[in-house]
Curated annotation (Swiss-Prot):
GO molecular function: calmodulin binding; structural constituent of myelin sheath
Locations listed in the record: Myelin membrane
Biological function: Is, with PLP, the most abundant protein component of the myelin membrane in the CNS. Has a role in both the formation and stabilization of this compact multilayer arrangement of bilayers. Each splice variant and charge isomer may have a specialized function in the assembly of an optimized, biochemically functional myelin membrane.
Omega-N-methylarginine modified-residue sites: 42, 48, 107
Gene: MBP
Symmetric dimethylarginine: residues bearing it: 107
Modified residue annotations for N-acetylalanine: 1
Entry PTM: As in other animals, several charge isomers may be produced as a result of optional post-translational modifications, such as phosphorylation of serine or threonine residues, deamidation of glutamine or asparagine residues, citrullination and methylation of arginine residues.
Record-listed Deamidated glutamine modification sites: 103, 148
GO cellular component, one term: protein-containing complex
Biological processes per GO annotation: myelination
Site (Cleavage): 90-91, 114-115
Protein name: Myelin basic protein
Naturally occurring in which organism (per UniProt): Sus scrofa (Pig)
Region Disordered, annotated ranges: 1-171
């Protein structure tokens, strides 16, 4: 192991450019994502040892190469991985429109958590619509069902109609 480290340190400049080039080409393939993370760990491990042993110049170089290596790789890895949850997130929001509430019940609770976060970004929409709706829903005996029902209605009608409609229908 001690023999490998200096060679890796000397080659860190080439390692950085080679690994980022590889990831630019293969970053989107899931097979390479795992190996990329492995090489990233090895890469960081080698660089962690280098600044301690090496001179000040070497330390600077290692720090620079890690940044150069980590940023493009994180962008390459982050995009496909971030895209999927986002896509799933929107699919989860859209799906309650079509299936019956019985199917949405399981999702209803988790969806309500997500929708709070999503609608919290549009304060007028989310808080204006949610806060009045949720208080009467919790007062009722069917707390979870009410919350889920108002949720699906808000998504179906876009919030405005369900806000005026659901509390009156409940009462």
């Amino acid at each position: 192991a001690s023999q490998k480290r200096p060679s890796q340190r000397h080659g860190s400049k080439y390692l950085a450019s080679a690994s980022t080039m590889d990831h630019a080409r293969h970053g989107f393939l899931p097979r390479h994502r795992d190996t990329g993370i492995d090489s990233l760990g090895r890469f960081f491990g080698a660089d962690r040892g280098a600044p301690k042993r090496g001179s000040g110049k070497d330390g600077h170089h290692a720090a620079r190469t890690t940044h150069y290596g980590s940023l493009p790789q994180k962008a390459q890895h982050g995009r496909p991985q971030d895209e999927n949850p986002v896509v799933h997130f929107f699919k989860n929001i859209v799906t309650p429109r079509t299936p019956p509430p019985s199917q949405g019940k399981g999702r209803g609770l988790s969806l309500s958590r997500f929708s709070w976060g999503a609608e919290g970004q549009k304060p007028g929409f989310g808080y204006g619509g949610r806060a009045p709706d949720y208080k009467p829903a919790h007062k009722g005996l069917k707390g979870a069902q009410d919350a889920q029902g108002t949720l699906s209605k808000i998504f179906k009608l876009g919030g405005r109609d369900s806000r005026s409609g659901s509390p009156m229908a409940r009462r």
